[in-house]
């Protein structure tokens, strides 16, 4: 079941907001304890969408990130739990391994790992043509 979530928005935003460090597949300029890995990039066959990015984000215990989601994403938790505070809607979500959700562009969110194990999730982001 897909659910609208700040987390998905945050991840999509994070994926686009930070450029991958050349030759590494990892994003640069992220807070300590947060990594973003580019797993694949696909050309889009959907009108108005330039490409689809497939990425993995990891937050170590105690790590957090605040951002505004720039594009829609589809996510699936693969490890640990993630707290998502959607400052735009005023809602808080807990995302667990095995859950799936989507994000809403334009929402400001804070992603936090308050657990004792790493949180990881995979996500696809639709990058709209400019």
Model-derived segments and their meaning:
Residues 1-3:
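N-terminal secretory signal peptides that target proteins for export/translocation
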Residues 6-21:
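Bacterial N-terminal signal peptides
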Residues 21-27:
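Sec/Tat signal peptide C-region and signal peptidase I cleavage site
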Residues 31-66, 72, 125-126:
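A short glycine-rich, His/Asp/Glu-containing loop-to-beta-strand
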Residues 59-60, 88-107:
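Short acidic-glycine-tyrosine-enriched beta hairpin
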Residues 64-65, 81-85, 100:
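Short beta-strand segments in beta-sandwich/barrel cores
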Residues 70-89:
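Glycine- and acidic-residue-biased ligand/ion/polar-headgroup-sensing regions
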Residues 106-130:
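Ligand-binding loop in jelly-roll beta-barrel domains
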């Amino acid at each position: 079941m897909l659910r609208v979530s700040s987390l998905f928005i945050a991840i999509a935003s994070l994926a686009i907001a930070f450029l991958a460090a050349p030759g590494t597949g990892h994003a640069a300029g992220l807070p300590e304890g947060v990594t973003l890995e580019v797993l694949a990039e696909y050309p889009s066959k959907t009108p108005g969408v330039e490409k689809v990015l497939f990425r993995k984000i990891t937050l170590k215990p105690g790590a957090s990130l605040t951002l505004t989601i720039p594009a829609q994403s589809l996510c699936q938790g693969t490890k640990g739990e993630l707290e998502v505070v959607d400052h735009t809607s005023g809602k808080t979500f807990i995302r667990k391994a095995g859950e799936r959700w989507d994000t809403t562009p334009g929402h400001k969110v804070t992603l936090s790992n308050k657990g004792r194990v790493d949180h990881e999730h995979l996500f696809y982001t639709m990058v709209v043509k400019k």
